[in-house]
Amino acid sequence: MTGEHKRSSLIKRITNETKIQIALSLDGGPVSLAQSLFKDKDYSAEHAAQATSSQFISVNTGIGFLDHMLHALAKHGGWSVIIECVGDLHIDDHHSAEDTGIALGMAFKEALGHVRGIKRFGSGFAPLDEALSRAVIDMSNRPYAVVDLGLKREKIGDLSCEMIPHVLESFAQGAHVTMHVDCLRGFNDHHRAESAFKALAIAIKEAISSNGTDDIPSTKGVLF
């Protein structure tokens, strides 16, 4: 990882089902979009937003609990990010949740660039009251995800519980990473899901941190 590479990206992903745009900086700092998808309507009361001296986070997928999870991922990963999605929520939450995961993964992959001078592997544990989750990740260029959260409810807010692991799987697909995310214990599904996203944030932050060299961390000599 060199000091000259600004680890940021700006992407748009448009299908017949969703319109998504994301501005991402993996190291925090300012981010912006040229034009919001929501220019004609004030969604400020409906999305997850936070601004500090080191981070700017604004997430609006139209699905409140998904916004909450992505806010936690960005906050504890040290990112600045704007995520906007307009999707076919009149059908259900599947396309918006899945496509947001894919698009965020794509933005992450583009922002990270060539895997050089980073640790590559990361792991993290995060508790939330009675819940405890573990995440392990590899910047491998091998998209694969094993996610076991043990959720029992049908929905949390407007997000189907079956979509929560699928969002993580979709992120892995878009980012071309290998990751294992497990909730080890807990009985509150909100806590189980949130601790999982926080654990993943911690794992990602470690994996993309500097290893003190400019080497590609692979015996193959090539990643991404």
Swiss-Prot record:
Q: Name one GO molecular function term.
A: imidazoleglycerol-phosphate dehydratase activity
Keyword match Amino-acid biosynthesis: yes
Q: Write down the EC number.
A: 4.2.1.19
Checking InterPro entries in the record gives: IGPD_sf, ImidazoleglycerolP_deHydtase, ImidazoleglycerP_deHydtase_CS, Ribosomal_Su5_D2-typ_SF
Q: Any idea which UniProt keywords this protein has? A: Amino-acid biosynthesis, Histidine biosynthesis, Lyase
| Superkingdom assignment | Eukaryota
> Is Isomerase there in the keyword field?
no
Pfam families, per the entry: IGPD
| Associated pathway | Amino-acid biosynthesis; L-histidine biosynthesis; L-histidine from 5-phospho-alpha-D-ribose 1-diphosphate: step 6/9
GO BP terms, alphabetized: L-histidine biosynthetic process
CDD domains on file: IGPD
Give the reaction(s) catalysed: D-erythro-1-(imidazol-4-yl)glycerol 3-phosphate = 3-(imidazol-4-yl)-2-oxopropyl phosphate + H2O
Q: Which PROSITE patterns is this protein grouped with?
A: IGP_DEHYDRATASE_1, IGP_DEHYDRATASE_2
The entry assigns this protein to a family as follows: Belongs to the imidazoleglycerol-phosphate dehydratase family.
Specify the protein name.
Answer: Imidazoleglycerol-phosphate dehydratase
Source organism per UniProt: Komagataella pastoris (Yeast)
Q: Which gene encodes it?
A: HIS3
